[in-house]
């Protein structure tokens, strides 16, 4: 991906256009800073209520920002005129729980019975962390945020069940409390951390081997801090095995027209 710094000040519509044209194909952290990014889950209508209930019961990993009309790829509530078939840098196609393909455009997979869910993403509060002089390591290193499948069980709904996925950011020990305070203001994009410290306590064997994304350096004096993550539905798909589920590829988000501060409380 071209240097992110050139894209920090893009308007969301400009970023989506570059994504649609295939200019931006990598992770979206640091792009159109100040605007809310979202995870995608796309399912047939017959499974949509089950997933809606799953998200309602699991608001930390699955905070809903918008739900499309059946058969419409336009998320009218958060980005009028956008097209969820083309405006995400990379998609994943799961069939019966198996990752079948990663693609840059899902028009060939589109069905008229699809319903799309957009879920809050922790990339949204990273601008607030940076403004409080709290480092965001994956942005510093030009990597995708590391994500891990935990032993934290989600509340099941219909066919959907499985374990929570978390994202991890190393935070200097003296800034951990401030990081909790800052992110607590954004409950619509995962909010406060779900765990601080020992990764083994939540079933993570090694921080060097994330299940999704890239490992990042943890420096002396830093503490791993874990936030609920919108990649959770992908781990759930692997266990629940729906006929088909289309998602974003981890770290490759949909950029909405919502300003981050609109979601702050």
Swiss-Prot record:
Matches recorded under Pfam families: D-Glu_cyclase
Q: What class of enzyme is it?
A: lyase
Give the signal sequence positions: none
For this UniProt entry, the molecular function terms from Gene Ontology, in alphabetical order, are: lyase activity
Arranged from A to Z, the UniProt key words for this protein are: Lyase
Q: What is its EC number?
A: 4.2.1.-
UniProt cross-references to InterPro entries, sorted A to Z: D-Glu_cyclase (IPR009906), Putative_hydro-lyase (IPR038021), UPF0317 (IPR016938)
- The UniProt record lists the keyword Nucleotide-binding: no
Domain of life (superkingdom): Bacteria
Positions of disulphide bridges:
none
Q: Which family is annotated?
A: Belongs to the D-glutamate cyclase family.
HAMAP family to which the protein is assigned, alphabetical: Hydro_lyase (MF_01830)
NCBIfam families from the UniProt entry: PRK05463.1
Supply the PANTHER family for this chain: D-GLUTAMATE CYCLASE, MITOCHONDRIAL
What name does the UniProt record give this protein? Putative hydro-lyase Teth39_1160
Organism per entry: Thermoanaerobacter pseudethanolicus (strain ATCC 33223 / 39E)
């Amino acid at each position: 991906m071209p240097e992110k710094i050139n894209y920090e000040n893009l308007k969301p519509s400009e970023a989506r256009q570059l994504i649609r044209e295939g200019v931006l194909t990598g992770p979206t952290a640091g792009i159109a800073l100040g605007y809310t990014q979202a995870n995608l889950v796309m399912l047939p209508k017959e499974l949509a209520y089950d997933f809606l209930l799953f998200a309602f019961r699991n608001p930390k990993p699955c905070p809903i920002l918008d739900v499309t009309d059946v058969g419409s790829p336009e998320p009218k509530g958060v980005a009028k005129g956008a097209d969820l078939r083309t405006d995400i840098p990379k998609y994943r196609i799961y069939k019966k729980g198996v990752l079948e393909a990663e693609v840059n455009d899902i028009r060939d997979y589109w069905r008229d019975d699809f319903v799309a869910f957009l879920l809050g993403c922790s990339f949204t509060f990273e601008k607030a962390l940076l403004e409080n002089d709290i480092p965001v390591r994956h942005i510093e290193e030009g990597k995708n945020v590391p994500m891990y499948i935990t032993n934290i069980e989600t509340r099941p709904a219909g066919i959907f069940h499985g374990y929570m996925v978390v994202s991890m950011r190393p935070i200097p020990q003296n800034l951990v409390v401030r990081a909790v305070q800052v992110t607590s203001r954004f409950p619509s994009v995962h909010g406060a951390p779900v765990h601080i410290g020992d990764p083994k306590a939540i079933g993570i064997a090694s921080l060097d081997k994330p299940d999704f994304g890239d490992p990042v350096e943890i420096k002396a004096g830093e503490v791993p801090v874990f936030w609920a993550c919108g990649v959770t539905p992908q781990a759930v798909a692997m266990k629940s095995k729906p006929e088909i589920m289309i998602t974003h590829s981890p770290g490759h988000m949909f950029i909405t027209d919502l300003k981050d501060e609109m979601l702050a409380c």
